[in-house]
Amino acid sequence: MAPQHLPSTRMASPGMLLGLLLTSCLTLCLSCQNSNNFALTNPEKSIHQESDTKETREEEELDTEILEVFHPTQEWQTLQPGQAVPAGSHVRMNLQTGVNEVKLQQEDKFQNNLKGFKRGRRLDINANTYTSQDLKSALAKFKEGTEMENSKDELARQATVKQLFRPIEELKKEFDELNVVLETDMQIMVRLINKFNSSSSSLEEKVAALFDLEYYVHQMDNAQDLLSFGGLQVVINGLNSTEPLVKEYAAFVLGAAFSSNPKVQVEAIEGGALQKLLVILATNQPLPAKKKVLFALCSLLRHFPYAQQQFLKLGGLQVLRSLVQEKSAKVLAVRVVTLLYDLVTEKMFAEEEAELTQDSSPEKLQQYRQVQLLPGLQEQGWCEITAQLLALPEHDAREKVLQTLGALLTTCRDRYRQDLQLSRTLGRLQAEYQALASLELQEGEDDGYFRELLASINSLMKELR
């Protein structure tokens, strides 16, 4: 039985206790119902998400950040934090204040660098750099499209080349429409020979044809082609023309065709060219015609011992002697002396070469030995003729005569010693070239032209003592 003496305030009624219990249960149920809405996620995941969000915000802030470009001058100025310094500026830290200071190094460099900077835009540190993504993309395209690009470039190059050149058939067709014919050298020479050999051609046309023909026969193959279709004989027959101009230019063509062309030289001898050339030199002809004929004769005789034999048999030395003695043909004297010098030395070199090589079948040497040139020169009085030519006033002519005198020395030694005029001429020339050689030495020329001539004269005088 409950005590009766307890106060009423300390007594809990059963109804109140029941109400408190119901309130607690209701609160617990509501908490359990909303637990899913307010439950915590994985702590690590939340930390990473928070970090990524922070970095993203920082990048966005960095991307949207606008850097202020500092404009330095010639004086030191304080650099504020966040300011961009143009390239070429001088930056230092003030040890007293602890702040960075900037000034302009060179005004020109500063002005050039500021060209790329604009206010209100982000500073571009290096506009020529590439990102890693750019490089990866370019490399992928390069690997995929190299072969395709190469083939396209090659096709483009071929197309460009084709545009520069046109097919020969197309050109021929257009030339045919223009009445222009593409000719080979052979066809041109045939046309020129026909023009020269035509009775309907005028003198001017014949001379023009020969003049053009001389240009082509300088080539060895063309000269032999001229021989193959009979054009060479037509030109040789032109030496019989009554027109001096035709003789002159026919000899001009022959001289070019004979030069260093043995096959043409042989055919010319068989075609009677040598006889015709000597006849022109022996008769009264204009000097220009004789010059061209002498040129053709020299081309025919050089390096052709059989032609030299025939030249001696046909009285060639007598013809040349008469030519040199003509007063109107003195200009040809040096050319004649040069020809004789070439023929004498050519034979000497052939004999020396045969001895050095010890050729078992010296056919060429045998041909040269049959050329009795030196005895013929002595018999025809060429020892005296060459000595007289030493009196020519030209230095070049004297040089060639001195060379010829030296080549003929073994044959003409006695004649030279008995020639008083030659002795006086050599003495006079010795004094003249001593003075000229002294002038050369004063000008610093140790091996001058006149010194060489003086040496030749001294050597010849020594041999004749």
UniProtKB/Swiss-Prot annotation:
- Tell me the compartments it is located in: Endoplasmic reticulum lumen
Q: Name one GO biological process term.
A: protein transport
User: What is a GO molecular function of this protein?
Assistant: adenyl-nucleotide exchange factor activity
From the record, give the transmembrane residue ranges: none
Q: Cite the InterPro entries for this sequence.
A: ARM-like, ARM-type_fold, Hsp70_NEF-Inhibitors
Q: How is it modified after translation?
A: N-glycosylated. Ubiquitinated by the CRL2(FEM1A) and CRL2(FEM1C) complexes, which recognize the -Lys-Xaa-Xaa-Arg C-degron at the C-terminus, leading to its degradation.
Q: What is the tissue specificity?
A: Expressed in several areas of the brain including the cerebellum, cerebral cortex, cortical neurons, glial cells of white matter, hippocampus, olfactory bulb, Purkinje cells, inferior olive and the choroids plexus. Also expressed in the eye and skeletal muscle.
Q: Where is this region: Interaction with HSPA5 and localization to the endoplasmic reticulum?
A: 1-260
Q: What is its main location?
A: endoplasmic reticulum
Where is the signal peptide, in residue numbers? 1-31
* UniProt-annotated glycosylation sites, renumbered to this chain: 197, 240
Q: Which UniProt keywords apply?
A: Endoplasmic reticulum, Glycoprotein, Protein transport, Signal, Translocation, Transport, Ubl conjugation
GO cellular component, alphabetical, reads: endoplasmic reticulum; endoplasmic reticulum lumen
Effect of inactivating the gene:
Mice develop adult-onset ataxia with cerebellar Purkinje cell loss. Affected cells have intracellular protein accumulations in the endoplasmic reticulum and the nucleus.
Purpose: Required for protein translocation and folding in the endoplasmic reticulum (ER). Functions as a nucleotide exchange factor for the ER lumenal chaperone HSPA5.
Family listed: Belongs to the SIL1 family.
This protein is called Nucleotide exchange factor SIL1
Q: Which organism is it from?
A: Mus musculus
Gene from which the chain derives: Sil1
